[in-house]
Design a protein with these regions (language model features):
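AMP-dependent adenylate-forming
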Residues: 2-26, 127
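Hydrophobic alpha-helical segments in the ANL/AMP-binding
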Residues: 4-5, 42, 60-79, 88-89, ...
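Conserved AMP-binding/adenylate-forming core of the ANL superfamily
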Residues: 15-59, 84-89
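ANL superfamily adenylate-forming
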Residues: 20, 108-157, 165, 171-190, ...
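Short beta-strand->loop structural element characteristic of the AMP-binding/adenylate-forming
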Residues: 53-55, 62, 66, 70-101, ...
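Gly/Ser/Thr-rich phosphate-binding loop
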Residues: 155-157, 161, 225, 250-255, ...
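Conserved AMP-binding/adenylation subdomain of ANL enzymes
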Residues: 178-208, 212-252, 266
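Conserved ATP/PPi-binding loop(s) of AMP-dependent carboxylate-activating enzymes
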Residues: 335, 348-380
């Protein structure tokens, strides 16, 4: 559900806990902070359909900013802080951002971008530099009540650019008043985490990956929308992750194969040091997981490991649980959103066992397009 419901409903229950610092944002604070952000964006003249970009480390205000943009009907783009300044500049300009938010942690990057982002409202968390105003100071001037014209925004994340310039994955903005009924809400991956992974308001979700990636951003948003609690690691560390599972009684988590590998390379004393009994669902994706690595993880954690295959476009979703994987080792599961086709360069189906390009069949490819690139959109949705 929406922060406007969860705030009054769950009040002082933690929505976000930063595992390293211990900083907490409650559901009511998430509601109020996102209202203040939305009020700020409207005061700057941003209207539904406009764009905002933000680049920061795993920061406690990452999701209050994302929810503020969502409540404002904006397209919001989270950018990797590991990119070069020229790459960041390209994305900010390509997405048409009218607001750019970063943090003091990335001060050097901010300084190098200041002159190239003329005409863009620039804000910084935890301090100021050059042409960047304090985001916290600005929102503190704003009311904590909702803006009058709330409507549903959408994330517009950029692909990795492995086949050229990064491409923004865009979806249409729904200009209708924002729904406050759970069955109408389409916030993040709420339905996925609820339906496929049995998440609810009592879930406690561990997020160890960079938040600017589509999966951590979407899954955290989904859990928060249910009224759950997200425990966010500032950065991944094998022992710190295990300690967090014990300390916060984690029920759900999400990983990538390199994290599994780093777990398994750790001292056995560390692996057996922590109580992991609360852990019910461990989700992984992002890259192929070596069979022997997954076998060892299931031996260690038990049959709680779930895998999926999808993309930022979310035009397809394939998933399997541990039992299904053990009976078909190497699989990523069955499609949940329609048939899959493996085609050759001439768009012909290839026989089982042969390589080809993966195509998901579905209604208008789930409504996505590549921002400013009709040809690539046409090529990806034929």
């Amino acid at each position: 559900m929406h922060p406007g419901i969860n705030g009054p409903k769950f009040k002082d229950k933690p929505a976000i806990i930063m595992a390293g610092s211990g900083d907490i944002i409650t559901h009511q604070e998430l509601n109020e902070l996102s209202n203040q952000g939305a009020q700020l964006f409207r005061s700057l003249g941003l209207k539904p359909g406009d764009s905002l970009a933000f680049m920061m480390e795993n920061h406690k205000l990452f999701f209050p900013i994302a929810f503020a943009a969502y409540r404002s009907g904006l397209k919001y783009t989270a950018i990797s802080w590991r990119l070069q300044a020229s790459e960041v500049e390209y994305i900010v300009k390509d997405c048409g951002a009218k607001v750019f938010i970063t943090s003091k942690f990335l001060e050097e990057s901010a300084k190098s971008l200041a002159n190239s982002l003329q005409g863009v409202h620039k804000f910084m968390l935890d301090g100021i530099t050059d042409d960047f105003k304090s985001y916290e100071e600005q929102i503190n001037k704003m009311p904590t009540t909702p803006i009058e014209d709330e409507c549903q925004g959408a994330a517009m994340l950029y692909s990795s650019g492995t086949t050229g310039k990064p491409k923004g994955v865009s979806r249409e903005i729904n200009l209708n008043p924002l729904p406050y009924k759970a069955e109408e809400d389409d916030l993040g991956l709420t339905r996925v985490v609820q339906g496929l992974y049995s998440a609810d308001e009592n879930s406690i979700y561990l997020s160890p990956a960079p938040l600017y990636h589509s999966a951590p951003m979407g899954f955290n948003t989904g859990f928060l929308a249910l009224g759950a609690t997200s425990i966010i690691l500032e950065k991944f560390d094998a022992e710190n992750a295990l300690a967090a599972i014990e300390k916060y009684k984690i029920t759900h988590s999400q990983w990538v194969p390199t994290m599994f590998i780093r777990f398994l390379k750790s001292d056995p004393e560390i692996l057996n040091k922590y109580d992991l009994s609360s852990h019910q669902i461990a989700i992984h994706a992002a890259a192929p997981c070596p069979i022997e690595v997954k076998e060892k993880m299931i031996d260690w954690w038990g049959p709680i490991i779930h895998e999926y295959y999808a993309g930022t476009e979310f035009n397809g979703f394939v998933a399997c649980n541990s039992e299904q994987w053990l009976s078909h080792k190497g699989t990523v599961g069955q499609s949940l959103l329609g048939p899959i086709h493996i085609l050759d360069d001439k768009q012909n189906e290839v026989p089982v066992g042969e390589e080809g390009t993966i195509y998901f069949e579905g209604p208008t490819a789930n409504g996505f397009s590549y921002h400013n690139d009709k040809e690539k959109t046409k090529g990806a949705t034929s």
